[in-house]
Regions:
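Core hydrophobic positions of leucine-rich repeats
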Residues: 1-6, 21-27
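A conserved mid-domain beta-alpha-beta active-site/ligand-binding segment of alpha/beta enzyme cores
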Residues: 27-83
């Protein structure tokens, strides 16, 4: 099963409470990603899963994945005539887009399950989100949310915390989620009020004096 790219979680033996705790921490998903995405079979070690050194190595592998060129693997895929990413065929334009989305799915997961996540790694992951926000040449950080997690508020919170919502892209973000739940739209509008409108109000106040 380790060769199955759709493997989502590996559940380790333990009490019901232990299994529930690992699920909340994302340990089972981290273990699955270690072999399906990060391709590090040394991390497939149930005796060390969740320990400090294991988490550190996992995060190092994630950062190494983000550092890879988005066309990495394309030449081999093309020359071998294989299919990648859930059985779909890709050309030189669509391949890097899907590669970034794959990376971003893991980034979002790690930020949502910040078990023993260091500040340095967290800052690096958030900076990666910002490089792919709405309004950039490669806005997949936003596209992943809209296409796959449109109604999941936690994803918008991570997106906002990373600094991906700006005055320049706010109107476009709001347009993209016009058909989303009221909770999502309220979150964005509240963010605008707290971060942008207040600044405008202070600027107007300064002009008065």
């Amino acid at each position: 099963f380790l060769g199955c790219r759709r493997l989502r979680e590996i559940v380790l033996n333990g009490t019901e409470e232990e299994r529930a705790l690992r699920t909340s921490q994302g340990i089972g998903r981290m273990l699955a990603l270690a072999v399906t995405i990060l391709h590090d079979y040394f991390l497939f070690d149930p005796t060390n899963v969740g320990k400090d050194e294991w988490v550190k190595r996992w995060d190092e592998k994630l950062l190494a994945l983000l550092a890879l060129d988005d066309l990495d693997g394309f030449e081999e895929l093309w020359t071998c005539g294989e299919e990648d990413y859930e059985g779909k065929d890709y050309d030189i334009k669509s391949y890097p887009v899907e590669k970034r989305k794959m990376k971003l799915r893991v980034v979002y997961f790690r930020l949502l399950h910040a078990y023993k996540l260091s500040d340095i790694v967290k800052d690096t992951l958030m900076a990666y989100l910002c490089r792919h926000t709405k309004g950039t040449d490669a806005p997949e950080a936003w596209e992943v949310i809209v296409e796959e997690h449109r109604s999941e508020l936690d994803y918008y919170r991570i997106f906002a915390e990373a600094g991906c919502i700006t005055e320049d892209n706010f109107a476009d973000l709001l347009e993209d989620i016009k058909d989303s739940d009221a909770e999502i739209k309220a979150f964005l509008l509240r963010y605008k009020e707290e971060h942008f409108d207040r600044k405008d109000a202070f600027a107007a106040f300064d002009l008065m004096w």
